[in-house]
C-alpha cells in the first residue's frame, strides 16, 4: 500500500489536478493587484507652420512624432466580485482536496484488494496442483486394482475423468493468478514478491454500525466535497450579483512625447483619473445569470443529500459484508475439518470394499471445494474490513499510519498563493 501511495498514476494525477486548482486562488487574487503596461509609438506627420513669430511660420514639412508611456490601472471596487471569486477558488481547492482524499482511499483499497487477490489465487493454485497430484496417485492405485480384478473399467474411467477436470482447474487457476498479478502491477507499480499474509484492519473498524454511519456522514470526503461545492455555488450567486454594483477604478499615466506637432514640440504629461461606472441596464443577461446561479445552488444541495444517502447505503452494505465474511470463515473452517474426517473414513471403507472409487473421488472433491471456499472466505474477511474503513472515510495514510511520508495538500497553495511574478512551478518546471 505504501508503494501504491507513492507511485500510483491515478493518485499522482489527482495530486497534479489539485496543484493546478491551487493556481486559481492566485489567478483571482490578481483582481486586487494593479495592472501596469508600457507603450511606445512612432509615426510620420505633415505639418504647416502657422505660429506668428516662429521660424516655422509659412513652412511645410514632415515631422516624426514619437513617444513612450506608462499606464497603471488599480481596481478600487468591483461589487465584491474579486472577494467572492477568491473565496470561491478557495472553496474549490478544499473540495478538490477532498477529491484527492477520495482517490487516495480508492487507491489504497484497490491495492489491498489486489494484494489479497494475489495471495488467495496463489493459495488456490497450490490446492489445485496438489489435487492433481492426489488424483494422479488415485488413478495409479485404481489401475493397479483394476489389473488384479478388484475394480471395473468404470472406476478407472471415473478416476481419469476427475484427473482431467483437475488439470483444467489448474489451468484456470493459473490464468486467474496471472490476471491478479497484472492488476497488482497496474495499481502498485511492481510485481508481487514474497507477499506476507494479509491481516484484517479491525482496529480501525468502528465498534458498531450506528457509529460507522455517524463517522461516515461526518468525515467521508465525498460528502465534504459536495458541501464545498454548495459553498462554491452560493458564492457564484454573489459573483453574479456583483455585476449590478457600481465599478470603480483609478488610472495613472505618464507619457513622454517628441516632435508631436512639429520638430522640437516635446513634452511630458502625467495624469491620475478615477472612474466610476454605474450599470443601469445591460439587456437582462445579468439577471438571468443570477437566477441560473441560484438554481445551481439548489442542485448542489440536492447532490449533497444524494451523496449522504449513497454513503449511508455503502456503509450498511460493507458492514453486512464484513459480518457475513466473519461467519463464513468460521463455517468454512468447520466444513474443512468435517470433510477431512469424511475423506479419511471413505478411504478406509474403500479399502475393505464398502465404498466405491466414485465415493472416494467425491469426498476428495468436497474437501477441495471446502478448502477453496475457506481461502475465499479468508480473503473476503480481510478485504471487507478495508472496505468498511474506506466506506466511513478513514482509509488514508494519515489515519492508518502507513510507513510513508504523507503528501501535503496545503504546501503547494502556500507556495503560490501570493506570487506576483514567475512562470516556474515550485518544483522548478
Language-model regions, residue ranges each:
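Bacterial Sec-pathway N-terminal export signals of envelope proteins
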Residues: 1-41, 47, 75, 192-230, ...
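Amphipathic alpha-helical coiled-coil segments and their boundaries
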Residues: 7, 14, 75, 82, ...
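Small/polar (Gly/Ser/Thr/Ala-rich) solvent-exposed segments
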Residues: 12, 35-62, 73-102, 224, ...
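Outer-membrane beta-barrel architecture
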Residues: 26, 71, 236-239, 275-277
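Acidic, low-complexity, intrinsically disordered peripheral segments
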Residues: 46, 375-429
Amino acid at each position: 500500500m505504501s508503494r501504491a501511495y507513492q507511485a500510483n498514476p491515478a493518485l499522482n494525477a489527482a495530486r497534479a489536478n489539485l496543484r493546478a486548482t491551487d493556481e486559481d486562488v492566485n489567478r483571482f487574487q490578481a483582481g486586487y493587484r494593479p495592472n501596469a503596461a508600457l507603450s511606445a509609438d512612432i509615426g510620420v506627420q505633415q505639418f504647416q507652420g502657422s505660429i506668428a513669430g516662429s521660424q516655422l511660420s509659412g513652412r511645410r514639412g514632415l515631422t516624426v512624432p514619437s513617444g513612450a508611456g506608462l499606464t497603471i490601472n488599480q481596481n478600487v471596487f468591483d461589487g465584491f466580485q474579486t472577494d467572492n471569486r477568491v473565496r470561491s477558488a478557495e472553496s474549490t481547492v478544499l473540495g478538490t482536496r477532498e477529491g484527492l482524499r477520495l482517490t487516495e482511499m480508492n487507491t489504497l483499497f484497490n491495492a489491498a484488494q489486489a494484494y489479497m487477490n494475489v495471495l488467495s489465487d496463489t493459495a488456490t493454485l497450490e490446492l489445485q496442483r496438489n489435487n492433481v497430484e492426489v488424483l494422479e496417485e488415485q488413478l495409479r492405485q485404481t489401475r493397479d486394482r483394476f489389473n488384479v480384478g478388484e475394480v471395473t473399467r468404470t472406476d478407472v474411467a471415473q478416476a481419469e475423468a476427475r484427473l482431467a477436470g483437475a488439470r483444467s482447474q489448474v489451468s484456470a487457476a493459473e490464468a486467474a493468478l496471472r490476471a491478479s498479478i497484472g492488476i497488482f502491477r497496474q495499481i502498485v507499480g511492481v510485481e508481487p514478491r514474497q507477499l506476507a499474509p494479509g491481516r484484517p484492519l479491525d482496529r480501525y473498524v468502528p465498534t458498531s454500525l450506528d457509529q460507522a454511519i455517524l463517522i461516515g456522514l461526518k468525515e467521508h470526503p465525498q460528502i465534504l466535497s459536495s458541501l464545498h461545492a454548495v459553498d462554491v455555488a452560493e458564492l457564484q450567486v454573489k459573483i453574479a450579483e456583483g455585476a449590478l454594483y457600481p465599478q470603480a477604478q483609478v488610472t495613472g499615466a505618464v507619457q513622454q512625447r517628441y516632435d508631436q506637432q512639429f520638430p522640437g514640440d516635446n513634452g511630458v504629461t502625467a495624469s491620475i483619473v478615477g472612474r466610476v461606472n454605474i450599470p443601469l441596464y445591460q439587456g437582462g443577461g445579468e439577471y438571468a445569470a443570477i437566477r441560473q446561479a441560484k438554481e445551481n445552488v439548489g442542485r448542489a444541495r440536492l447532490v449533497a443529500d444524494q451523496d449522504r444517502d449513497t454513503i449511508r447505503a455503502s456503509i450498511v452494505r460493507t458492514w453486512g459484508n464484513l459480518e457475513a465474511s466473519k461467519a463464513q470463515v468460521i463455517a468454512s473452517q468447520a466444513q474443512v475439518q468435517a470433510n477431512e474426517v469424511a475423506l479419511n473414513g471413505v478411504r478406509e471403507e474403500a479399502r475393505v470394499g464398502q465404498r466405491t472409487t466414485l465415493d472416494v473421488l467425491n469426498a476428495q472433491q468436497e474437501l477441495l471445494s471446502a478448502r477453496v471456499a475457506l481461502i475465499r472466505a479468508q480473503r473476503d474477511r480481510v478485504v471487507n474490513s478495508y472496505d468498511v474503513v474506506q466506506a466511513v472515510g478513514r482509509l488514508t495514510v494519515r489515519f492508518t499510519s502507513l510507513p510513508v511520508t504523507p503528501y501535503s495538500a496545503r504546501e503547494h497553495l502556500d507556495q503560490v498563493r501570493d506570487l506576483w511574478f514567475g512562470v516556474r512551478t515550485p518544483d522548478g518546471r
